Amino acid sequence: KKILAAGLTAVMAMSLMVGCGSKKDDSSSKTYNLGIIQFAEHGSLDNCRKGFLKGLESEGIKEGENLKITYKNSQADTATDNQIASNFASKKLDMICAIATPSAQSAYNATKDSDIPVVYTAVTSPKAAGFVDKEGKNVGNITGTSDLVLADKQLKLIRQMMPKAKNVGIFY
């Protein structure tokens, strides 16, 4: 599920980055400047970052070729998150990838008055974080994927698909 979320985030990022290039006809000469803010070192968050970058690479955007990455980890400190996000915003990066809710909130707040797109992943409730309106539509310059596990809906689907199942397990 985390890898799928990271992959979907990368696809969204790719579509945003296409619009971030210069006005040149040859977009292959563009080098994108990407800032990545990760809230903490954690296996699932690390996988989100790796999946995001792998998704970009599958679309031809690769570090060292046409992508410059500035990666920062706030070590679970929201004040550090805010500083990183402000720094990224002042550098006018092409895009910010924010991993986990606190990092996404910091990036969103730092870029509200700019056109820097923010793509988040590992955000449990985009609505509660203020990234979508009451209809579920993105607000401002931010989009991404949620890591919310809807176990009740998953179990309902399993029951529909396998009504005779007696033992069901969900890996998370």
Where are the regions a protein language model picked out?
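C-terminal motif of bacterial Sec signal peptides marking the signal peptidase cleavage site
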Residues: 15-19
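Glycine-rich phosphate/adenylate-binding loop
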Residues: 1
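Short hydrophobic alpha-helices and adjacent helix-cap/hinge residues
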Residues: 4-8, 21-172
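Core hydrophobic alpha-helical transmembrane segments of single-pass membrane proteins
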Residues: 9-14
